[in-house]
């Protein structure tokens, strides 16, 4: 498959794509990667690293067209390709596009993928690599623009949104296997894992159960995991600080198992007031993004754990996800762990209900849902 990968500045896409390429090589698959930004810098030897977006738009467009021309020529006979580029830029020139329709058509992409990550991480990377004054709000707006522009591009080039995907970069563990499978294993089933988040952050046993569920699904399917972007936890911490009257203080953002990278040596510092300024954006984009992740999946598999006191861990978010999947004709599978029986709103919309993750996996395997794998299990 031929894929175009987009994402705002600050996503650190190049090492991610190289990791996908290396992973493909380990599976015996040829996967070629093109980094449009690197090709542009190679052409513009007078431009210092990190400064290319400060060029006049006319020269920037000329450099980009020259770079894409090289990519089109170089990738013509290659089977599996990832082109690392952007759909939009929000820079000192304002908002502007980063592609030309004629060249995207000439690339003949099969899918367009927009890569996303937690906004405080994107903001941190952006300011580490570039001399620019961008707020968390700026980064939130840019991410939404990048997603929309990529989706519109897929509709224009592919004729529908069926080849458009939102993929999180992954912070606890990167999602190189997900992108590899999208490009090199396109026939694998695509799954949206659904589980409670906000209500269980202080329940380590339940978190471990959820992590096991997520890991098992990702072993056998292409998964689009909503827990890989966990900005709601950041907002909850900011709100708690604000209630203490500490809106001008800083938050040290530490990793969490839902999406935090345990490899970062120092926590990222963000101002409480700046997080509160994007409260509506965080909630709105979670709502939009999670539904899009369901739309791009073949089926939803939801884990309903039993919380202390025998209470079903069925959050309002999980209920809405199940209903959205049902109304959009997705296969709906529920792993129901509580002793209390599920309500008709679950039983009447679920394709099948299981009592354990192992039972669900056995059923999926018996139905031939597990994709074919190579000798390495991928």
Write out the residue ranges for each language-model feature:
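Glycine-rich phosphate-binding loop used to anchor ATP phosphates in small-molecule kinases
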Residues: 59-106, 293, 313-314
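Residue-level signature of transmembrane alpha-helix interfaces in integral membrane proteins
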Residues: 53, 100, 236-238
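Conserved NTP-binding/hydrolysis module of P-loop NTPases
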Residues: 44-54
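Conserved catalytic or regulatory cores that recognize and/or transform ribose-phosphate-containing ligands
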Residues: 1-29, 34-42, 58-59, 89-92, ...
């Amino acid at each position: 498959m031929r894929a175009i990968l987009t994402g705002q500045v600050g996503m650190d896409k190049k090492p991610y794509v190289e990791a996908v390429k290396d992973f493909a090589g380990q599976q015996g698959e040829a996967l070629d990667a093109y980094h449009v930004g690197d090709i542009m810098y190679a052409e513009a030897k007078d431009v210092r690293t990190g400064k290319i977006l400060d060029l006049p738009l006319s020269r920037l467009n000329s450099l980009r067209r020259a770079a894409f021309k090289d990519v089109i020529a170089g990738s013509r006979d290659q089977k599996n390709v990832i082109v690392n580029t952007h759909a939009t830029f929000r820079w000192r020139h304002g908002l502007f596009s980063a592609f030309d329709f004629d060249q995207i058509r000439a690339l003949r992409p099969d899918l367009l993928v927009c890569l996303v990550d937690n906004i405080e991480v994107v903001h941190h990377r952006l300011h580490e690599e570039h001399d620019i004054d961008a707020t968390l709000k700026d980064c939130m707006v840019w991410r939404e623009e990048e997603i929309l522009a990529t989706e519109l591009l897929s509709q224009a080039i592919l004729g529908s949104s069926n080849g458009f995907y939102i993929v999180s970069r992954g912070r606890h563990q990167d999602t190189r296997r997900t992108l590899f499978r999208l490009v090199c294993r396109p026939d694998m089933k695509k799954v949206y894992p659904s589980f409670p988040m906000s209500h269980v952050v202080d329940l380590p046993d339940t978190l471990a159960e959820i992590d096991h569920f997520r890991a098992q699904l990702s072993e056998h399917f292409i998964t689009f995991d909503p827990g890989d972007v966990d900005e709601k936890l950041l907002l909850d911490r900011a709100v708690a600080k604000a209630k203490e009257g500490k809106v001008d203080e800083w938050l040290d953002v530490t990793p969490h198992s839902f999406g935090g990278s345990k490899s970062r040596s120092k926590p990222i510092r963000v101002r409480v007031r700046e997080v509160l300024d994007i409260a509506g954006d965080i909630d709105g984009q979670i709502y939009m993004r999670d539904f899009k992740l369901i739309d791009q999946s073949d089926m939803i598999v939801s884990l309903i754990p039993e919380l202390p006191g025998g209470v079903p861990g069925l959050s309002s978010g999980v209920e809405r996800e199940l209903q959205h999947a049902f109304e959009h004709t997705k296969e709906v599978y529920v792993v129901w762990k509580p002793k209390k029986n599920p309500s008709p709103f679950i039983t009447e919309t679920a394709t099948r209900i299981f009592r354990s993750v192992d039972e669900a996996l056995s059923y999926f395997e018996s139905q031939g849902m597990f994709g074919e794998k190579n000798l390495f299990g991928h």
